[in-house]
Amino acid sequence: SITTLTKNKTFEDIFDKNSEAEIDHISLSRRADLIIVLPTTANFMTKLSIGKAEDLATTVLLASNKDILLVPAMNVRMWLHKATQRNLKILQDYGYHFIGPEKGEMACGEYGEGKMSSPRQIYSYLKNYFDQKNLVKKKILKL
């Protein structure tokens, strides 16, 4: 499991019965200096754009005052849909950061914009992001 491999606790639910002393989604939202959602689906973008907090990931993001990086990945038609583009604008206006999506071949066999950015592009973005900041005692939370 991820817990075994990383030797860190993993979180799955909004409320963990074993850690009732603190509210996990609030404490998690405070731990990281940058939160990355990878991949970010059209559905997830919709939840964030309307402030729907129904699971651990959405509650962490809505409770956070940290930088949030979204890495969209979806079918080209989903990406270009007016609702998705409206949600993109709303999230950009809220201050969310985006990498991609890129043009390329999709898992479904179609070609176009919607492919998740490559690990190299994401690494380059993160390196640039953190090169501009003092990294002493900083943490990154991946959702």
Model-derived regions, located:
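A cross-family phosphate/adenosyl-ligand binding-site feature
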Residues: S1-I68, V76-L141
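Cofactor-binding loop segments of dinucleotide-utilizing enzymes, especially the Rossmann-like FAD-
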Residues: A73
